[in-house]
A protein has these predicted regions:
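Glycine-rich beta-strand-turn "strand-cap" elements at beta-sheet edges
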Residues: 2, 39-51, 76-99
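Active-site-flanking beta-strand signature of metal-NTP-handling nucleotidyl enzymes
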Residues: 3-8
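Short hydrophobic/aromatic beta-strand micro-patches
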Residues: 9, 41, 53-55
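Short, surface-exposed ligand-recognition loops at beta-strand->loop->(often short) alpha-helix junctions
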Residues: 10-18
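Residue-level signal for secondary-structure boundary sites
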Residues: 16, 60-62, 97-99
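An amphipathic, aromatic/His-enriched active-site/gating alpha helix that lines ligand/cofactor pockets
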Residues: 24-36, 55-90
Length: 99
């Protein structure tokens, strides 16, 4: 299992628009090959900063299957007008789950 962490800074005043768009985009992720879960967190210290936490079965499910699809283009069309700049994306694997 791979956890994608995407950090997105949203343009000032577009937080509600971004949240509405990302809520609609959840359906796209739900039907994406290998996507296991999708959550969005908003920073308390920096309210214009969001982190998408997306679990994929494999790295390729994200980097090949999803980003090469029309679904990815549809997702980006819903939310990218709200982006302050390009998202920062990192893929992680579980090293320890203590409890």
């Amino acid at each position: 299992m791979i956890l994608e962490i995407a950090q997105i800074d949203v343009k000032p005043g577009l937080e509600a628009e971004f949240e509405a768009g990302i809520a609609k985009a959840a359906a796209i992720f739900k039907s994406a090959k290998g996507c296991r879960s999708f959550a969005v967190r908003r920073s308390i210290e920096k309210p214009q900063r969001y982190r998408l936490l997306i679990e994929w079965e494999t790295l390729e499910n994200h980097t090949v299957d999803f980003t090469g699809s029309q679904a990815w283009k549809d997702y980006r069309a819903m939310v990218s007008p709200c982006f302050e700049g390009p998202p920062s994306v990192e893929h992680t694997e579980l090293a320890l789950q203590a409890f």
